[in-house]
Amino acid sequence: CKLGDDGSDVAVRLGDRIIRYRLNVPGRHWVQNSLAVLGTVSALGGDPDRAAAALADLTAPKGRGARVNVQTPAGLLTVIDDSYNASPASMRAAFAVLGNTRPQSGGRRIAVLGDMLELGAKSAQQHAALAGDLEANRIDQVFCAGPDMAALDNVLPTAMRGGKATDSKSLAPQVCNAVTAGDVVLVKGSLGSRMALIVDALRALETNDGLE
């Protein structure tokens, strides 16, 4: 498997055959999902070659890793909209995707993160534990929305702290004022964190309607 910033080239052995196919969505987790699909198709007696070919048409849906190019007055930036849901595992998978995405010249890798909800008594610890993964994936700046994400902000290196707020609506202006041409911006959080508001604010920069 060869992972790229815009997708993956996969070769899998099924019995005595090797099937090669292209996924046009980036991330190891998408590769793992595709392997499960091919295994299921094969087990049910279907045609894994046809299934592999169909996987080339797969696109990440809105809120689940869809990429949006935003042409701002300053230049182009890329938004990775992963705002629909979040867990510790899916956060780490998203960081890996961001880490494998090369910003344009002068750009940065930016993570804008909202609370992961329903984690119980150890929620703060699980949020703080994401710091090492952010550093390992060479994320340049991190913005945090929500009381649980404040625990992450508290343990980040000073140079990585982009800003924090109590909720996504309050954080949106900070993010919009910070992004520059060439940046790749991941927006992720549980649905209840309403991180889609920040995606919308970033998209509005294209028409100069961003938040003041």
Model-predicted regions and their roles:
Residues 11-13:
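A general beta-strand register signal
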Residues 1-3:
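Residue-level recognition of beta-strand microenvironments
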Residues 5-6, 16-20, 24-29, 35-212:
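ATP-dependent carboxylate-amine ligase
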